[in-house]
A protein has these predicted regions:
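Short amphipathic alpha-helical segments and helix-helix/interface helices
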Residues: 42, 98, 145, 176, ...
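Aromatic- and carboxylate-lined catalytic core of secreted/periplasmic carbohydrate-active enzymes
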Residues: 250-252, 267-399, 416-427
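Non-catalytic accessory regions flanking glycosidase/transglycosidase catalytic cores in CAZymes
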Residues: 1-48, 363, 375-400, 414-427
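Catalytic-core region of carbohydrate-active enzymes that cleave or remodel glycosidic bonds
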Residues: 204, 209-296
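Structured helix-beta-strand junction loops
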Residues: 48-49, 104, 150-151, 206, ...
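Active-site flanking residues adjacent to catalytic metal/cofactor-binding acidic residues
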Residues: 155, 159, 245, 390
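Active-site mouth of glycoside hydrolases
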Residues: 2-221
Length: 427
């Protein structure tokens, strides 16, 4: 059995038990990873607690160069895909990799049509030579269904797409409708472009859960995306499970060829801000060097896509510390038996949007504090049983202090050097 939407319509369950979607991003798996490296990767992420893999079914347009030669279609004399000539060997290979992943206990979130294959998207406008003809969608979707559906994947209909043009939307709508008919028990979503909020109603209706992308743009005006996006989805769309499927990746160069990279703190901040704003169905980790599967001595096309700087090889990227920070989110959810969150921003009196607060299903108040400060709450001290403060980098724990102040109470500063999660037990 695959994942199902829980009865609260806001999270997932599997076999009747709550399921926190903790994914790693491995878009280029089917084209770039050999068998031995695949098994090493799977066992390592499994040890870290990950339970979902996000993979692109077709070749990732900004994957790193590879010596492997896996092509989903036969090619013409110019090297372009002949979309009426599927390569069975490619899909057999992808199927085999998925079977191994399932043996390690992973769920599969498979992207059906990355935006470069769909006309009039931002990526297709940059690189249009492998645009899938509309009439070939049927044959491709049939092949996708035959190859993967009995593995109970999540089908992510789009990849990194904008939805500005009717022709683009028509591709995704057709693919979604076909898969709903062929694979009615497989949940569907869309993976949209960074910072995209507005999704056509006809596509919203097709989705079983929502993915948004706070993305990799480091401009100051975009720093609030991890909580602005879930706020928008919650306000404007019907209730469905919601998650940040592409926060900033660890060690990813800033987009638009801007100098700098995202580090452990930035990716942790994006995750906790999204989750405590209402995107608590799960979170996706990403590491530069893993999603493109970069190896020593191979090229990375900086000019393709959003203009990211070159990554480290996957051998280094797999050991980035932020992957443990994301796995610790699931540990916290499990340890505190958290299955649902509701925003508690109204309890904060600091007036700082970067600080996020949420109430759990079991009388806990969670507060994420990216920079150390006193926290003013619209609560009486008598409403609080105890406060545990977790240093999100070292996992050290501190017993918090609280005192009365005008209009409520004041939680004292912590003694750590990093961002922290306050777990407030309410009476």
């Amino acid at each position: 059995m695959g994942l199902k939407v829980a009865i609260n319509k806001k999270s997932f369950e599997k076999n009747g038990k709550s399921f926190f979607y903790l994914a790693d991003t491995c878009w280029s798996a089917f084209t770039n990873i050999n068998e031995n490296d695949w098994k090493y990767y799977l066992q390592y992420r499994k040890r870290q607690g990950y339970n979902v893999l996000q993979i692109n079914i077709l070749p990732q347009w900004d994957a790193s160069a590879t010596d492997l030669n896996h092509s989903p279609y036969q090619k013409d004399e110019k090297g372009n895909y002949q979309f009426d000539k599927l390569n069975d060997s490619y899909f057999n290979h992808a199927r085999s990799m998925c079977e191994v992943a399932k043996e390690y206990g992973f769920e599969l979130a498979l992207v059906v049509l990355w935006c470069n294959y769909v006309p009039a998207t931002w990526a297709n406008n940059m690189l249009s030579h492998n645009t899938m003809p509309y009439e070939e969608i049927d044959g491709y979707i049939k092949k996708v269904n035959e190859t993967f559906t009995d593995l109970d994947p999540l089908y992510v209909i789009s990849g990194d797409t904008d939805l500005n043009e009717e022709i683009s939307c028509s591709y995704y709508l057709k693919a979604s409708q076909l898969l709903h008919e062929l694979a009615p028990n497989c949940l569907q979503s869309l993976h949209v472009r960074g910072r995209l909020m507005e999704i056509p109603e006809k596509l919203i209706k097709q989705m079983d859960f929502y993915m948004f992308q706070s993305g990799h743009n480091a401009k100051l005006e975009n720093r609030a995306m991890p909580y602005c996006l879930p706020e928008y989805f919650i306000e404007h769309y019907p209730v469905k499970p919601l998650l940040n499927s592409e926060p900033c990746y660890e060690q990813m160069g800033y987009s638009s060829n801007m100098y700098g990279r995202f580090h452990q703190f930035e990716i942790r901040r994006a995750a906790w801000q999204s989750i405590l704003t209402g995107a608590f169905a799960g979170i996706t980790y990403g590491a530069a060097g893993i999603y493109s599967w970069h190896t020593y001595g191979k090229e990375f096309a900086n000019e393709v896509g959003e203009g990211f700087d070159s990554p480290n090889p996957w051998h280094l990227a797999i050991h980035y510390p932020g992957a443990w920070d994301y796995s610790d989110i699931k540990v916290i959810f499990d340890n505190y038996e958290i299955t649902e969150l509701s925003s508690a921003q109204n309890l904060l009196m600091n007036g700082i949007d970067d600080i996020r607060a949420a109430l759990t299903n079991n009388k806990l108040l969670l507060i994420y504090v990216p920079e150390n400060t006193k926290i003013k709450l619209k609560l009486e001290t008598t409403a609080i049983d105890k406060i545990t403060i977790i240093d999100l980098e070292t996992r050290h724990r501190e017993v918090g202090t609280v005192s009365s102040c005008q209009g409520g109470c004041m939680v004292g500063m912590h003694i750590f050097e990093h961002d922290a999660l306050y777990v407030v037990d309410l009476k």
